[in-house]
């Protein structure tokens, strides 16, 4: 069976998945829609999943590269935020399916409140100074994947090149998937552990997980880490993105007391 068929989801199954998350159902129950609707390929997908984690997550001090940036949340005594459960897999979730991206014409643009608008081709983008970040990954649908190493370019480097103006307080990230956007407070976008990533655990990020380049903002829920990113705009005022317009939290901090900042009414 073609693995792209296994990992593909539909807006219907995504909606069910998120609805179950609202009502605090356990992690295994939240996965039932995918078990039912994965085109009868769910077990095959488990067996061939190259990202399955057999071992316990490493501790930050076990990372052998001294140049790797350590996300501060990995130093917590309990690395699982409120209402979350650990998964050893790397589930695939998206709003519109995986877009077909022509790498020859791929570009990344920076505009808005900047001194110098920027546009890079993929080759140019991957020549930017690289960083490595060790971080955990928390999905609003109540699963957390610990122990990830991302490679790419720091968001701080992008901001420095573009010359972000002082009045910029928010970032609107846009993706190649049918006009998808998400908003991020600039202080989170510019955290030391935030980056525009092209690799995960030493391998190129596969298309179903947001490759060739995706945003990673480890200190917010993962819907803020836009897949298939094509640009960022620096703004003075906050502007709701795709999920935020539907009621998701404008910030999305998983560590807020209670149940995290999942929805605007939470």
Regions found by a protein language model. Give the residues of each.
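Arg/Gly-rich low-complexity intrinsically disordered repeat tracts
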Residues: 15-37
């Amino acid at each position: 069976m073609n693995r792209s068929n296994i990992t593909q989801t539909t807006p219907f199954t995504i909606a069910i998945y998120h609805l179950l998350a609202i009502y605090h159902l356990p992690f295994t129950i939240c996965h039932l829609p995918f078990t039912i609707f994965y085109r009868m390929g769910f077990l095959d997908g488990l067996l061939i999943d190259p990202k399955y984690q057999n071992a316990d997550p490493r501790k930050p001090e076990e990372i052998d590269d001294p140049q790797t940036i350590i996300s501060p949340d990995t130093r917590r005594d309990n690395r699982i935020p409120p209402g979350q459960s650990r998964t050893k897999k790397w589930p695939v979730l998206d709003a519109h399916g995986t877009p077909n991206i022509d790498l020859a014409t791929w570009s990344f643009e920076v505009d808005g409140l900047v001194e110098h608008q920027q546009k890079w081709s993929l080759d140019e983008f991957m020549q930017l100074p690289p960083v490595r970040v060790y971080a955990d990954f928390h999905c609003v649908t109540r699963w957390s994947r610990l122990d990830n190493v991302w490679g790419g370019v720091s968001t701080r480097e992008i901001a420095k090149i573009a010359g972000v103006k002082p009045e910029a307080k928010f970032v609107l990230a846009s993706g190649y998937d049918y006009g998808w956007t998400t908003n991020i407070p600039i202080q989170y976008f510019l955290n030391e552990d935030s980056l525009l990533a092209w690799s995960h655990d030493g391998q190129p990020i596969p298309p179903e997980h947001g490759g060739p380049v995706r945003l990673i903002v480890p200190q917010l829920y993962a819907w803020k880490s836009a897949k298939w990113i094509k640009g960022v705009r620096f703004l003075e005022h906050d502007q709701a993105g795709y999920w935020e317009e539907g009621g998701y939290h404008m910030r999305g901090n998983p560590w807020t007391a209670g149940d995290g900042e999942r929805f605007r009414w939470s």
